[in-house]
Amino acid sequence: MIKSLNISAIYSSPINRAMQTAEIVGKHCDVKPILDDRLIELDMGKFTMMPYDEIFASHGNVFLKFYEGSLEISHNGVESFSEVQKRVFDIVDFVKNKHKGENVVLVTHMDPIKAMIGKVLSLKSEILFQLIIANASLNVFKYDDQNFYLSSINSMNSSRFHESF
């Protein structure tokens, strides 16, 4: 099924779980994944490896603060949401220029996906915080030479969208 989507390139976060997904997709469409650091997950700064309960107890809801752009987040070494959006759209711009009119897969993580969705749909921080991105789900964005559109979110079956590619 995936081979018929004519995937011309796969770009992946270098984080292991993303690379594994990219390799699986690549085997099915005969495309070798390209690793790109712009697709990595959010850098949690001093909160890296801390249990969520500890983070919330000492700093409140840091995830909502992250989407709101709170200075408390950056003071703790956490990458800001605007920084995540900038690096995500940096690779998206690169891909859309290099692969004009082609189907390209980006294998990434929740916050980079939310960065793209948030910008495309102009979502507020409260909505982004509540939005769940399912593991291994397909989120389809289309570009018409002027604008991006969200065609699918959290899809687990690409056959439903096969005709739209």
Which residues fall in each region the model found?
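Phosphate-coordination/substrate-recognition cap region in phosphate-metabolizing enzymes
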Residues: 1-63
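ANL superfamily AMP-binding
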Residues: 1-5, 91-96
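Short beta-strand scaffold positions
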Residues: 12-13, 86, 107-108
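Amphipathic, non-transmembrane alpha-helical scaffold segments
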Residues: 15, 56, 81, 85-89
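Alpha-helix capping/helix-boundary segments
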Residues: 17, 112-113
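Acidic, low-complexity terminal tails and accessory targeting/binding regions
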Residues: 31-34, 42-54, 97-102, 118-165
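Short glycine/proline- and acidic residue-enriched helix-loop micro-motifs
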Residues: 62-83
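Generic beta-sheet signal
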Residues: 102-110
